[in-house]
Amino acid sequence: MKDYCAIEQIYHRPLDELLGEALQAKKLSGRNGVQFCQLLNIKSGGCSEDCKYCAQSAHYRTPIEKGALLDEEEILQAGLQAKEKGASRFCLGAAWRGLFEGETKTKKICKIISKISSLGMELCLSAGFLTEKTALMLKESGLKVYNHNLNTGPSYYPRIASTHRFEDRLQTIRIVQKVGLKLCSGGIIGMGERLKDRLEMLFCLYSLPEAPESIPINVYMPIEGTPFYGTPPLDYMDLIRMIATTRILFPLSRIRLAAGRKLLDEKTLTLCYLAGVDSIFIGEKLLTQSNVQLEKDYALLKKLNLRKEER
């Protein structure tokens, strides 16, 4: 069991040693391909939470308009299209505080999950905070994976949101693991946080009873109207070291390069794969922001002699 200081030492290793160990750790999973995931925003905007990086918060004036929950047929068709494009995981995101007992939307989400479970894809949901009862309802409906990111470390968290606490996020993560759902949990880097905050986040994930099944690493994308707009861009080497350190700590977890991939050039993306990334989001949009074109993903994988993971 590594402590925070040990994680910090890993991060600061000479780059050749860091990448070499990350490659060895990646081999332990036995996976050879890159997983394709498709993310669908099933309910956009109007969120009650005040996360300062988020275009979907009702607290800020952004280009994102509040939308109603998509109906079952729209979601089903989007899932079929994702499957045709090669996605093996279908991820649904909803902008609200969470899912709680007695709410109409909770019943609607469970009904949607039951219907699209027949697609033959692994289904993931990101819908905010849960209670143990609602987590069980989701599982019984056919959900396999629940996403709930820590986003940053506990020291920096009060700087990014005031409508909930870091401990609230940890509580939902504990519930997800307790009921037997697979956990997807990671964070965002480049929001003005310190290295210490990023490593604190990794340490919190590392301290869980069970490692997350997947860990998304998001590069902050500045969105006009949000408080963090204008934050200086992330140094690409910070991203590479973060990915490699995550891979070493979590050899069996999927490391997913999520939001912000469009900001990275081909050389940086190549280093990301070398550092341990084995999962990406495909599709034209990631919730509210544009994504890398699928043709470019395939072209880079071909150039690197990497293959898409088959179902």
Curated annotation (Swiss-Prot):
<dbReference type="Pfam" id="PF04055">
    <property type="entry name" value="Radical_SAM"/>
</dbReference>
<feature type="binding site">
    <location>
        <position position="54"/>
    </location>
    <ligand>
        <name>[4Fe-4S] cluster</name>
    </ligand>
</feature>
<keyword id="KW-0808">Transferase</keyword>
<feature type="domain" description="Radical SAM core">
    <location>
        <begin position="32"/>
        <end position="258"/>
    </location>
</feature>
<dbReference type="GO" id="GO:0051539">
    <property type="term" value="F:4 iron, 4 sulfur cluster binding"/>
</dbReference>
<feature type="binding site">
    <location>
        <position position="124"/>
    </location>
    <ligand>
        <name>[2Fe-2S] cluster</name>
    </ligand>
</feature>
<dbReference type="GO" id="GO:0004076">
    <property type="term" value="F:biotin synthase activity"/>
</dbReference>
<comment type="similarity">
    <text>Belongs to the radical SAM superfamily. Biotin synthase family.</text>
</comment>
<keyword id="KW-0408">Iron</keyword>
<keyword id="KW-0004">4Fe-4S</keyword>
<comment type="pathway">
    <text>Cofactor biosynthesis; biotin biosynthesis; biotin from 7,8-diaminononanoate: step 2/2.</text>
</comment>
<feature type="binding site">
    <location>
        <position position="51"/>
    </location>
    <ligand>
        <name>[4Fe-4S] cluster</name>
    </ligand>
</feature>
<dbReference type="InterPro" id="IPR024177">
    <property type="entry name" value="Biotin_synthase"/>
</dbReference>
<feature type="binding site">
    <location>
        <position position="91"/>
    </location>
    <ligand>
        <name>[2Fe-2S] cluster</name>
    </ligand>
</feature>
<keyword id="KW-0093">Biotin biosynthesis</keyword>
<keyword id="KW-0411">Iron-sulfur</keyword>
<dbReference type="GO" id="GO:0009102">
    <property type="term" value="P:biotin biosynthetic process"/>
</dbReference>
<dbReference type="InterPro" id="IPR013785">
    <property type="entry name" value="Aldolase_TIM"/>
</dbReference>
<keyword id="KW-0949">S-adenosyl-L-methionine</keyword>
<feature type="binding site">
    <location>
        <position position="184"/>
    </location>
    <ligand>
        <name>[2Fe-2S] cluster</name>
    </ligand>
</feature>
<dbReference type="InterPro" id="IPR006638">
    <property type="entry name" value="Elp3/MiaA/NifB-like_rSAM"/>
</dbReference>
<dbReference type="InterPro" id="IPR010722">
    <property type="entry name" value="BATS_dom"/>
</dbReference>
<keyword id="KW-0001">2Fe-2S</keyword>
<comment type="subunit">
    <text>Homodimer.</text>
</comment>
<keyword id="KW-0479">Metal-binding</keyword>
<feature type="binding site">
    <location>
        <position position="47"/>
    </location>
    <ligand>
        <name>[4Fe-4S] cluster</name>
    </ligand>
</feature>
<dbReference type="GO" id="GO:0005506">
    <property type="term" value="F:iron ion binding"/>
</dbReference>
<protein>
    <recommendedName>
        <fullName>Biotin synthase</fullName>
        <ecNumber>2.8.1.6</ecNumber>
    </recommendedName>
</protein>
<dbReference type="InterPro" id="IPR007197">
    <property type="entry name" value="rSAM"/>
</dbReference>
<feature type="binding site">
    <location>
        <position position="256"/>
    </location>
    <ligand>
        <name>[2Fe-2S] cluster</name>
    </ligand>
</feature>
<dbReference type="GO" id="GO:0051537">
    <property type="term" value="F:2 iron, 2 sulfur cluster binding"/>
</dbReference>
<dbReference type="Pfam" id="PF06968">
    <property type="entry name" value="BATS"/>
</dbReference>
<dbReference type="InterPro" id="IPR002684">
    <property type="entry name" value="Biotin_synth/BioAB"/>
</dbReference>
<comment type="function">
    <text>Catalyzes the conversion of dethiobiotin (DTB) to biotin by the insertion of a sulfur atom into dethiobiotin via a radical-based mechanism.</text>
</comment>
